[in-house]
């Protein structure tokens, strides 16, 4: 019998569960020492020793699977709210609604439909059908402060989605962003879907499952920076850890990015943040202290447009019709700035 999820939402998890500790039979330290990629490409990063090892671990230990139809039966326990108090919806982060099966990684951007990755408990989550429909298959990314004409979707009296259809972007609530990022990383690694944060050509996409006929190869999240930012802003909570335990009892495998979120940074050759609370505490012990600095932005001609700052991203409005002149840093080595059109990161 699958136990009920007894964790607490938004209670930061600072210790590995007993199941998590036992899962890494040779010790996670061996994995943590493997080389990740030196590329910012999600496709090229699949060739690294760390990626291959994590994929093998999550594949080899997945000794069982469930059907697409049976998912709600398992969710009643794996996604229980506070023990047995209803089913927790994914984006809405509350109970109630008209439940539907949500592919967090959109079907149209994957090689699966309702088999394999399309019926994996670590991937598919319950969501209100109206919210699910609004989410559509848009690329996840920052919308607030980036697209001023964005639309919102509310559920149970609170906004749960911000989206811009014409820009193919949707943003979830801050307290769901980490959960979502860790699901995407799992699908990327376990099911070998290369278009995590870049568009991938048909030649480099995995073959379709027997019930699938479409994979656009479009990215599921806008950038690696956004992925890691969301991971850090919304750390693993005890509910996620408990859910990982519950799903392991069904499928045999775990989402390693819940136990060790640090793998996300190591996969892509990024330095671990030292101020990041994780279940293992590895980031605190091995992360780099990042020097704090203040980010300000101003338009040189506010009659033509404005700029906004959100987290580490500066965006100029309108996106078209005028030229972004450049940037200056004080001190000069305070940060590395990348420019992509009207967006600085």
Report the location of each language-model feature.
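N-terminal module-boundary/linker segments of secreted carbohydrate-active enzymes
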Residues: 1-93, 266-286
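Generic detection of short hydrophobic beta-strand segments and adjacent strand-loop junctions
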Residues: 2, 11, 309, 344-345
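Domain-level detector of nuclease and nuclease-like folds
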Residues: 94-100, 104-287
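Short, solvent-exposed loop/edge segments of extracellular or virion-exposed proteins
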Residues: 291-310, 334
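Surface-exposed interfaces of beta-sheet-rich extracellular modules
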Residues: 313-345
């Amino acid at each position: 019998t699958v136990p009920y999820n007894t964790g607490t939402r938004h209670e930061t998890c600072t210790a590995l569960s007993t199941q998590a500790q036992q899962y890494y039979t040779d010790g996670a330290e061996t994995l943590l020492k493997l080389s990740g990629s030196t590329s910012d490409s999600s496709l090229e990063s699949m060739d690294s020793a760390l990626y291959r090892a994590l994929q093998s671990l999550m594949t080899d230990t997945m000794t069982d699977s469930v059907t697409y139809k049976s998912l709600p039966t398992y969710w009643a326990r794996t996604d229980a709210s506070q023990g047995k108090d209803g089913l927790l919806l994914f984006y809405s982060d509350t109970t109630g609604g008209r439940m539907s099966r949500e592919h967090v990684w959109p079907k149209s951007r994957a090689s699966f439909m309702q088999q394999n990755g399309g019926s994996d408990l670590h991937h598919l989550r319950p969501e209100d059908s109206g919210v699910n429909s609004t989410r559509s298959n848009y690329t996840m990314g920052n919308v607030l402060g980036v697209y001023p004409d964005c639309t919102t979707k509310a559920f149970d009296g609170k906004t749960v989605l911000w989206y811009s259809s014409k820009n193919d972007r949707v943003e979830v609530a801050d307290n769901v962003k980490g959960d979502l990022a860790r699901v995407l990383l799992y699908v990327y690694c376990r099911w070998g879907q290369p278009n995590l944060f870049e568009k991938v050509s048909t030649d480099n996409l995995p073959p379709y499952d027997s019930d699938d006929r479409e994979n656009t190869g479009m990215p599921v999240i806008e950038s690696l920076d956004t992925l890691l930012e969301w991971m850090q802003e919304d750390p693993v909570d005890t509910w996620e850890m408990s859910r990982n335990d519950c799903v392991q009892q069904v499928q045999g495998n775990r989402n390693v990015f819940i136990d060790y979120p640090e793998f996300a940074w190591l996969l892509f050759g990024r330095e671990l943040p030292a101020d990041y609370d994780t279940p293992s505490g590895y980031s605190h012990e091995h992360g780099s202290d990042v020097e704090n600095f203040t980010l300000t932005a101003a338009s040189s001609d506010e009659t033509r447009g404005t700029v906004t700052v959100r987290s580490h991203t500066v965006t100029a409005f309108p996106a078209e019709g005028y030229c972004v002149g450049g940037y200056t840093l004080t001190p000069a080595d305070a940060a590395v700035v990348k420019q992509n059109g009207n967006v600085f990161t």
